[in-house]
């Protein structure tokens, strides 16, 4: 099945992924549902499901709903995942939420002192050290305050606290790299109303589309801008016509692409080279 086909690919992606990595998974609704357990198996955490609504123009005029017995399908999904960091304590893997509480408990200090450390009334206990679903990762500034307080006032025999290597606490910039980037564009939701490709953007040979699954450049640029910065690496293992590479060039990202269909590769290679010449 589709899950078996994807698993070796996901296994290899996961070896190189870090907590800064965002994975955008394009597929049909049922395709995504089939592969989702494999993504979870290799440590990918679901964030959100974005729906590409291609609109009524995507529906063929001769669609016979009496025959197909369902509504016309005009959507694809693009699902956002991040690589969740784990912390290892005596060979036990802990998620960040559990590890933060574990480290503070080692200090011997009451949890109420986390508020004092952060200079807040109760935000630290309500947000950063809660056991419930309202938990979220402390910002780097708050984490730095928590770490400094713990290592200043915590029990001497447990120091250093909030350390990965047992030698020193995690630094502020290191903590920032334990969460994937995300920049939310104003006015954009998880439903993307964008027509199917037409005109010059749709690459054709003899009036026939070269790649039936070519994505709009605007949508690829959107997901790159939301989760990367200039100079970051973008990897597209199923590159097709290299729309991701084109978007990355425009956005000053470093893109690596792979495509095994020789005919599609030749067109994609030409497309990238011509686009690069325009930029020079």
Predicted regions and their residues:
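Short, conserved SAM-binding/catalytic segment
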Residues: 269-280
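Core catalytic lobe of class I
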Residues: 1-266
């Amino acid at each position: 099945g589709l899950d078996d086909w994807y698993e070796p690919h996901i296994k290899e992606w996961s070896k190189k992924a870090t907590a800064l990595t965002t994975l955008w998974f394009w597929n049909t609704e049922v395709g995504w549902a089939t592969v989702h357990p494999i993504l979870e198996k290799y440590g990918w955490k679901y964030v959100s499901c974005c729906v590409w609504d291609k609109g009524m123009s995507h529906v063929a005029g001769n669609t016979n709903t009496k025959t197909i017995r369902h509504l016309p399908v005009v959507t694809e999904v693009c699902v956002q995942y991040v690589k969740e960091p784990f912390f290892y304590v005596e060979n036990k893997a802990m998620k960040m939420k559990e590890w933060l509480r574990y480290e503070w408990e080692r200090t011997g200090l009451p949890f109420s002192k986390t508020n004092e450390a952060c200079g807040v009334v109760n935000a630290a206990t309500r947000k950063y050290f809660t056991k419930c679903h309202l938990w979220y990762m402390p910002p780097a500034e708050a984490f730095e305050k928590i770490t400094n307080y713990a290592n200043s006032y915590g029990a001497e025999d447990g120091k250093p606290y909030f350390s990965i290597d047992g030698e020193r606490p995690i630094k502020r910039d290191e903590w920032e790299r334990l969460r994937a980037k995300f920049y939310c564009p104003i006015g954009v939701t998880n439903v993307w109303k964008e027509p199917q490709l037409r005109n010059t953007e749709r690459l054709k040979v003899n009036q026939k589309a070269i790649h039936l699954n070519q994505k709009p450049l605007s949508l690829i640029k959107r997901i790159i801008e939301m989760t990367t910065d200039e100079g970051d690496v973008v990897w597209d293992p199923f590159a097709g016509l290299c729309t991701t590479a084109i978007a990355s060039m425009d956005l000053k990202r470093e893109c690596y692409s792979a495509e095994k269909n020789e005919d599609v590769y030749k067109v994609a290679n030409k497309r990238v080279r011509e686009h690069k010449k325009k930029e020079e």
